């Protein structure tokens, strides 16, 4: 089963939870209800069935939305062929790079992008320069936007890595990375949400006393479930390993 409401509640009430806000009690009441549902579900399972509860991300308080394409425009790195731009196809050949959510950056490479203008010979220098700019970008509060900026070679592997972004920004807590093409008045803004996804505090519970939880990774979930189901599989097909 999937509980989507946990995501929605955290987006709009996480700051209340973390900073003793107006709706902190309602936040706790919601999780008590989720816990109750999980308990009822576990009671209906046979004794030899292992229950696994996992989330694919954690949450953190959101302070600022970062409109990266607006930032690229202000840096002179993004240009559009029309003043009434609204989509990726409106980018001109004079553009150096563009961004897609969440924190994916593409060099406007000639021969790869529809209106590519950056040559293969200039690719590495252009990407290195953009990476340096992203690493030094600070928010209105003086905090660095990026926890780290990762190249495609380090971030992706597999049969389709050729379509991966050239750079990926992993944000510090407090920043939500945006990338629309209609334009924004400011690089940094505040929206209706006060909570945003984080990479480092996802939830994992395996109802097995011998399960290895320490240093677990999302990659470990699939082989764990396959082992619990006694399903044969080629262990070399997975990056993770079973926790049971």
Model-derived features: positions:
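Short secondary-structure boundary/capping segments
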Residues: 15-19, 65-74, 184-186
């Amino acid at each position: 089963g999937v509980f989507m409401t946990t995501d929605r509640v955290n987006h709009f009430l996480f700051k209340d939870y973390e900073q003793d806000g107006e709706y902190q009690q309602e936040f706790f009441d919601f999780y008590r209800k989720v816990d109750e549902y999980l308990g009822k579900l576990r009671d209906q399972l046979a004794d030899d069935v292992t229950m696994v509860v996992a989330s694919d991300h954690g949450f953190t308080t959101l302070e600022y939305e970062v409109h990266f394409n607006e930032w690229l425009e202000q840096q002179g790195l993004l240009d559009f062929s029309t003043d009434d731009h609204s989509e990726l196809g409106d980018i001109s050949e004079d553009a150096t790079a563009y961004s897609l959510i969440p924190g994916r950056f593409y060099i406007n490479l000639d021969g790869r992008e529809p209106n590519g203008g950056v040559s293969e010979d200039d690719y590495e220098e252009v990407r290195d320069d953009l990476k340096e700019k992203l690493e030094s970008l600070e928010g209105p509060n003086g905090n660095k936007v990026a926890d780290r900026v990762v190249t495609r070679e380090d971030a992706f592997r597999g049969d389709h890595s050729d379509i991966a972004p050239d750079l990926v920004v992993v944000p510090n807590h407090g920043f939500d990375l945006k990338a629309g093409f209609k334009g924004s008045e400011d690089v940094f803004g505040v929206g209706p949400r006060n909570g945003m996804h984080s990479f480092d505090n996802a939830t994992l519970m395996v109802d097995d006393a011998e399960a290895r939880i320490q240093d677990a990774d999302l990659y470990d979930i699939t082989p764990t479930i396959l082992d619990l189901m006694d399903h044969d599989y080629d262990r070399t097909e997975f990056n993770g390993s079973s926790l049971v």
